[in-house]
Amino acid sequence: MKKIGFVDYYISEWHANNYPVWIKQANEKLGTDYEVAYAWAEQDLSPVYNETTDEWCAKMGVSRCNTIAELCEKSDVIIVLAPSDPEKHLGYAREVLPFRKCTYIDKTFAPDFATAKEIFEIAEKYGTPFFSTSALRFADELDTLKGATDLIITGGGGNFAEYIIPVGRCIEC
């Protein structure tokens, strides 16, 4: 069993609440063996769901870590979340990537090019494999928009930069 550690600004948010189920579903479909086992959050109380890190961990069956270093030592794979706070990713990358464990950094990857470049440089320095993507890249539902001549895009999210991806997918269609 490969242990996944979540690093987040506040842990009770949409991605952290849904990824564990999706990972279990992927295990069943692909025959893999991963589980979200550890979590660390910079901010204890989620401003979105009003849930503490301890409450989230108890609900999800995950062990809370007191530091990012503790989480990295215990985990086989790291997922840096904070999808609504990409300005946090560089600081988390500075702590996570030296552990040389495969790391996923959630979208929006970085707030600007300079920050993204620095994250890549840190990963290269330590030889750490990492990636970032959006599940929306694989949303077949958006394929139905191909050939549309008029389009209105609506959506949630905290800011335009965070949710530019659906716009890009619609333009691509």
Outline where the language-model segments fall.
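Alpha-helix N-cap/loop-to-helix initiation residues
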Residues: S12, L45-S46, D85-P86, D112, ...
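A general structural motif
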Residues: M1, S75, R100, G127, ...
